[in-house]
């Protein structure tokens, strides 16, 4: 579970109020619950890494090469991608889809709560400079839409986008695929950043 910029892993517990949800799930499943990991993707309160490798840190490598193997070795977690998901809020939501589409060999499920359409730190040019040290090829390597087009159809991968704002272009994009954007939020659409 990955928070946004200006968040800490503890925010899932404090402001996210996740403990009653975990307790209810555990009670409903005979005392069994998933291993939940509240990760720090930035190393500090205001380091907006967007979970990429770049001048702000090697966050992608930290999450895929340090955190995941550690959880497997220290907690006996399964290494099967079908048993791994990434959930995130804001920047963490962007991280969730990015990590999953880039590493379907590691993660099979994501929940993107109010994430951006891709790693973002200003305009596209500003993002390339700030997150990738000016390397435009790295921007493309971490852009979810570019990654998905290059990968082709995914098998065994699923995701959930939760936002109170209808994603820009969602109606046109989903219409050509026979679907329409929906919100599971009791508030409907209207809120934070949008995935498109």
Regions found by a protein language model. Name each.
Residues 1-196:
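Non-catalytic cap/lid and distal C-terminal segments of serine-dependent acyl enzymes
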